[in-house]
Amino acid sequence: MTLPLDGVRIIAIEQYGAGPFGTQHLADLGAEVIKIENPAEGGDVGRLVGPHFFEPGDSHFFQSFNRNKKSMTLDLKSPEGMEILRELAAQSDAVFNN
């Protein structure tokens, strides 16, 4: 079954609740959402919110707002990280930030 946003790529620089909730709907509608997480902070702070499935960091809260997404860590404070972000953005339909 084809979904309305099949073929749309969105780079999501987001964390916690509102941003991930919004892009979750876009992913559910078929968009390829690539979530960018900060490695220096351990990724999205939503990972720390309980309850946890099996161990700390495996948060039910995080999983529920980030289903159907791809995820990668990227240091946006480094020149290399910013270059990778620019390359991803050039190959995407939208960049989302909250």
Predicted feature descriptions by range:
Residues 1-98:
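N-terminal helix-loop segment corresponding to the beta1-alpha1 unit
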